[in-house]
């Protein structure tokens, strides 16, 4: 067993009482904001424990602390509902063990404390660091997520050369997102009475949760109403490695009986009649089957109509119904397509029947939770550029419950309080008669706060804010405004774009204007809040922003979503130009002589492409982590299923499809001879999704052609910019470049 670990004695950062010199949002004010993370309701529904991360720019680091706050049981006005949470101290990932005890992570172990932050005790004492945890219903066991060594692809260093840094690699997926893969996560079950640990995937070279972003939500304990039954676990796993992993998104949900201790007997809920052992055998005997790894899986046998019934796409995030009869999970239909429509699948564990209960919602389900009747599910998803709350029955009757110009985030069911037959002369409490959900909400001008949402009747939900984490900063700022606008595209479709206006907006003036190019390429331009691509701070610097929901974005139906794959430089680029041209023609405050185009990832690719095809519309460009040379990108990226699906074919195939031929012939690097506009290129050298050589190549090409250009390179950042001082440098460089050319 590992030695007891002391909690961190470093200076603890808490809420920053920054006093602003003006009402303009600055990078420093943005990084002074607290960021609400995971949260959990108490078993009686009266309190919420939640984490907030604070940053110190001076020390260039962050810490996360836990608060507890009351949840009103009855309808309350927002001013009455908001209260200051009680700070409990350092920690993250809080969960309630009972009405008074909270478990949380600190320094790689599980700790407990009471609801006032006192009596802090280390609960686990395990080898390795715990990255996530989930208690069994009877709280006698807990699943721990820990990393185990993995050397199937990167060889172990020779024992006599312990300081060598070279890596001997024999297959693909040797690096993922921002790290070389020399360990993978496994789920362990710890018996809290005996101290025994069981690695569910012991000896298996497969991940659970799935990298790089999967967490404890990919694992669930069965609930049956009998808290003594704590032996069944559902877990998510992609039973593949190396080349097979790199070209496939096929993950499954497995049902593991802890009493058997044999993961190979775990039932595969996605592929009925098979087990985890069957998947392992297939992974060994025929890792890729008859798949051609240099072509899209779109038309290969794995996605034939016969195979689609076996869920060959992403399946993840299982959740059992309260009565234990059903398990639901998020499911994509096709293998190799990471942006397929994510549906809500429900499996009846008694009959084995699977059904999809969100088919009438022509967009993706982002998150969901069971209602306490085991017949209702609540979910969130994007539609027409906002993320709202919906409800579905087991028969697939979908009802929209909120209709806000905002994005609602992850959701939890607030338990009903202990029954009390009568209050106030026989009238039942509000919490007794309605479903209550705990959710987070944000929009372009407000970072995330927690809300209580009360579902009343068939189609109405009312919300009240519980936290006001950053009101002390927001109250010092002048807010901008935004509005949706529709325009006609070149193929006579209707396109929605957001118009974001600066604070103190004066309609009689003209403003420099930015075209925002979204990434993904299938990520929504909804009411997101970002600490980098933040429309509030852009508007505060005096810019109007035009943010189109171009072809390829979710929330406008599957046909609209799929019109981008294999056509990166086609209609989606015309949609960008339709939006900015409509804004210039219809909005008198848009200064057509001072336009810029900015974007990241696919948005950065879009900027590189527009640089050679904009017909002098724009006066400057900014590309962050964008793809520049698609032939190089095809084999540089680590998740090859992405380039296969999006490009349609490998660049070396003589029989490549017309879509692939069009993709490579229109790669931005082939139009550098048409570049004529200043460009800022930004890239992180730990970005293994789109390698930094892409940004360097674009910058080098621009300078060799005599074009004004700058390169902001981060040796220690990935696809994102995560460190405080790097983030502020990013914002300063971003606006210095825009101001130089547009003001």
Where are these regions (language model features)?
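Hydrophobic or amphipathic alpha-helical targeting/insertion segments
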Residues: 104-154
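Active-site-proximal cap/loop segments of hydrolase catalytic domains
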Residues: 539, 547-743
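Short glycine/acidic-enriched loop and turn motifs that connect beta-strands
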Residues: 54-58, 149-152, 240-243, 333-337, ...
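Predominantly five- to eight-bladed beta-propeller fold
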Residues: 10-13, 63-64, 147-193, 197-203, ...
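Beta-strand-rich domains and repeat architectures in extracellular enzymes and scaffolds
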Residues: 28-64
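Cap/lid segment of the alpha/beta-hydrolase catalytic domain
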Residues: 241, 469-593, 600, 635, ...
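Short loop/turn segments that connect beta-strands within beta-propeller blades
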Residues: 71-74, 114-118, 192-195, 258-261, ...
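Conserved beta-propeller blade repeats
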Residues: 33-48, 85-103, 127-142, 174-180, ...
